Amino acid sequence: MANKREYPLEKTRNIGIMAHIDAGKTTATERILYYTGKIHKIGETHDGASQMDWMEEEKERGITITSAATTAVWKDTRINIIDTPGHVDFTVEVERALRVLDGAVTVLDAQAGVEPQTETVWRQADDFNVPRLVFANKMDKMGANFDYSVKTIKERLNVTPLPIQMPIGAEDEFAGVIDLVKMVAYIYDEDKLGENWDTVEIPADMKDEAESRHDAMIETLADVNDDIMEKYLEGAEISVDEIKAAIRQATLDQELFPVMAGSAYKDKGIQMMLDAVLDYLPSPVDVKPFVAHDEEGNAIELTAGDDKPFAALAFKIATDPFVGRLTFLRVYTGSLKSGSYVLNATKGKRERIGRLLQMHSNQQNEISEVFSGDIAAAIGLKNTTTGDSLTDPDHPLQLESMDFPEPVIQVSVEPKSKADQDKMDKGLQKLAEEDPTFKAETNPETGETLIAGMGELHLDIIVERLRREFNAEVTVGKPQVSYREAFTKQVSAQGKFVRQSGGKGQYGDVWIEFTPLEEGAGFEFEDAIVGGVVPREYIPAVEQGLKEAMENGVLAGYPLVDLHAKLYDGSYHEVDSSEAAFKVAASLALRNAAPKGGAVILEPIMKVDIVAPEDNLGDVMGHVTARRGSIDGMEERGNAQLVHSFVPLSEMFGYATTLRSATQGRGTFTMTFDHYSAVPKSIQEEIIEKNGGK
């Protein structure tokens, strides 16, 4: 058990590997682990043998679902790697990873360049100010084109790429790369799993092109670096070290994004990519100070260092079959020994760290202490959930929490037997702890269990995990859309609840003004009572009554959202008034306001990006309009077209099959939640009728 810092902070890298699905990201991570000596046999994703894809569901589907954290050592530096999913249903895993990373490697498919999901994860990385390198992977693939990939970075991501290599050959002829910084060539030995390569002079027939690309690289650097600009204008020699220092600074400032070439599957270019991680991506010391807040709400800037009070963020909860509940931590400042107490500043509870583990995919090495800049997993934290701040009990700090999107799709799940009921309940509770975008609840009227998530694949995998990890056999209903309800007009209404039939009666009377708010604003309650017409002690009951009534909506039983309620008048009875009576009165006011408040049903609208061959463009546009969608623009993608559109989620069920048959399997689409919008009147009536009205 190691207990002193093995690698200085400057020699630590916390990086993520991010990409569009099928760009070869998991294979690239595998190769990193192989060359850094962490694994002895390479696992291929398409054989279901990859180390990082450790859940059974991932092995079967060949996609990465949970971002496994692993640690590796390259040269004299420790690299903590978080492998993130590329499928849109799992964007929350990407957000979680980016929140705690210092830098990232974006893997592109060199034939496709920047794809829709690349754009999504790139924008997420922008939100978290994460410096990035780009690795144009699959250079051995038919149609691979490095220059095209670089062009797509510029055009689709709207940033300045900096090619620091050029490939030697492409497709079957891909043999190695030219290093434009050192101006040498690396030619790989075909037989040795990429472990051997020769550093040679640039081939004579490529020398002129390499020179001109080197000059272009220097010009791009000169635009963002005054020292390079000065030497460039004077025609002075610029050393390799000066070039590297300038690239590093421009990468850290996110002014430039170095681009490299390789083929993870054919074992080419990975070691150079690792060198670039060391040369150009930040250590915890290089990143901007992290902002936290003390108990008074004052902003405090945290910079990495072991000699400061302990502060960490819990960024993921996972259930391990052998050790139970694992809490993944990113330590920002200070150090922590196993067995010590921490304060969960988010929940205001003290917790004891049982054991500390360093993770390698799903295998663990026990350690006795973690330090500033580390990523590790803790056992023993019972009350900690994703996004909680863990700090030194004497120095409580609130690290900025994470925001997660609300689920947009739900299905009912029913246990097949009584024994399955308990297993299912336990499993759903555990899975909801792990994943903030997954929710499970019981419908109070029908008693059925509903699970909600970010997409069909997300829920498929939840059900699969119930079966596999918790032995719960369940029947799954048809997917349903998570509709909402909203007012569209300002309206005032009275709610009066009076019951006087012998004995103690009930009396509550309120006047409330309801004002619709913009999407995502939530519920706001305003107490505007003057002169005690509604006594103080009943006002919280009015607010609570409204909240409970809003949960069940006013039209078809869906939650009513984004509403400001101003309680401005009412009356009470000395004897008969009670909290319960005012709760009922508040719910009646809401019900009475609905007809004049222009209540509507809102549906989730998805951003749907469809890539289809040119010949099928007419069909695809027809698909969008037939599904009540709108086209938002098109771009050429080689000999295919990318159609940007917005389509209601309710119309997208089963679309994968439609697209597959229309394009003979050549079309693909990605779908992410964009916003909520009112459904057309006719559809609103159908929904109300189907739900039996209110």
UniProtKB/Swiss-Prot annotation:
Gene3D superfamilies tied to this protein: 3.30.230.10, 3.30.70.240, Elongation Factor G (Translational Gtpase), domain 3 (3.30.70.870), P-loop containing nucleotide triphosphate hydrolases (3.40.50.300), Translation factors (2.40.30.10)
Keyword Disulfide bond carried by entry: no
Assigned protein family: Belongs to the TRAFAC class translation factor GTPase superfamily. Classic translation factor GTPase family. EF-G/EF-2 subfamily.
Protein name in the entry: Elongation factor G
Residue stretches making up the tr-type G domain: 10-285
Function statement: Catalyzes the GTP-dependent ribosomal translocation step during translation elongation. During this step, the ribosome changes from the pre-translocational (PRE) to the post-translocational (POST) state as the newly formed A-site-bound peptidyl-tRNA and P-site-bound deacylated tRNA move to the P and E sites, respectively. Catalyzes the coordinated movement of the two tRNA molecules, the mRNA and conformational changes in the ribosome.
Organism: Limosilactobacillus fermentum (strain NBRC 3956 / LMG 18251) (Lactobacillus fermentum)
Subcellular location: Cytoplasm
A Pfam family per the record: EFG_C
Signal sequence, start to end: none
Record's keyword terms, sorted: Cytoplasm, Elongation factor, GTP-binding, Nucleotide-binding, Protein biosynthesis
GO molecular function: GTP binding; GTPase activity; translation elongation factor activity
SUPFAM superfamilies assigned: EF-G C-terminal domain-like, P-loop containing nucleoside triphosphate hydrolases, Ribosomal protein S5 domain 2-like, Translation proteins
An example Gene Ontology CC term for this record: cytoplasm
PROSITE patterns, A to Z: G_TR_1, G_TR_2
GO biological process terms, semicolon-separated: ribosome disassembly
Positions with a binding annotation for GTP: 19-26, 83-87, 137-140
Main location: cytoplasm
